[in-house]
């Protein structure tokens, strides 16, 4: 199988090997039939919805921290890590424009321009600079972020420099280079307390055990990006149709085994 689905050679394959022809054929066909019969049961391990709906659910929830996975731009899966779509949606909402709105941590977004200014002005200063959309600007352009610098940390192996900028009720973690935030210490090192925060948005997919155990609730947002998980939304260029789930009512494919000669014979 392959996740690089936009190619005529990509499809799901059941491969069985052995030295008994009848057993190999029957095993392959039986397993393929099981995959096909259960195709509609394959789901994410957490609920999924749009980024807009994710924010609405998080704002209304009394469980904290309500963690949202911004998974379409997950750098650990191959995303650029600097797509601004989700953060832009957050900053546009009136709920987060006031200091006493729902507390939110956004982790994280690269912004070398803002980092440079924050290092010069220091903690407690007002800073304004561009963040994000350096590598991937297909869905949203750079954000001109302004706010108060509440933390600066240098020397991180991945981010190099981390700066927290507070704007309204949102704490935005800005980095020199992209970094996934997997551990509580990633936040507390920046004087942020994720356990006592209403909403935490992370650019990862499935939650690592530490964040999973911390969550009050969790949803995976089908956000745009280089690793967009909304399969039906992707603009396929090279694909053999019909293919499930793009064609949900397609007829059963040919599940007969095809024999391949042993390579050294």
Positions of PLM-derived features:
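Metallocofactor- and cofactor-centric catalytic cores in central/energy metabolism, strongly enriched
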Residues: 11-13, 18-20, 32-66, 76
């Amino acid at each position: 199988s392959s996740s690089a689905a936009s190619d005529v050679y990509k499809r799901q394959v059941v491969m069985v090997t052995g030295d008994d022809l009848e057993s190999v054929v029957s095993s392959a066909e039986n397993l393929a039939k099981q995959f096909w019969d259960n195709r509609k049961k394959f789901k994410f391990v957490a609920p999924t919805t749009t980024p807009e709906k994710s924010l609405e659910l998080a704002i209304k929830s009394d469980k904290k921290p309500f963690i949202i996975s911004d998974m379409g731009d997950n750098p650990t899966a191959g995303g650029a890590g600097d797509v601004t779509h989700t953060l832009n949606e957050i900053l546009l909402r009136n709920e987060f424009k006031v200091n006493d709105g729902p507390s939110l941590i956004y982790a994280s977004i690269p912004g070398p321009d803002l980092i440079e200014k924050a290092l010069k002005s220091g903690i407690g200063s007002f800073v304004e600079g561009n963040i994000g959309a350096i590598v991937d600007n297909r869905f949203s352009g750079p954000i001109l972020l302004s706010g108060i610098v509440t933390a600066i940390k240098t020397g991180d192996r991945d981010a190099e420099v981390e700066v927290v900028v507070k704007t309204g009720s949102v704490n935005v973690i800005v980095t020199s280079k992209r970094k996934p935030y997997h551990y509580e210490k990633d936040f507390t090192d920046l004087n942020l307390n994720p356990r006592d925060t209403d909403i935490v948005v992370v650019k990862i997919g499935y939650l690592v055990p530490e964040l999973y155990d911390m969550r009050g609730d969790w949803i995976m947002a089908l956000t745009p990006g280089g690793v967009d998980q909304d399969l039906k939304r992707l603009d396929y260029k090279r694909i053999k149709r019909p293919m499930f789930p793009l064609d949900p009512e397609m007829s059963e494919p040919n599940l007969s085994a095809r024999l391949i000669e042993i390579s050294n014979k």
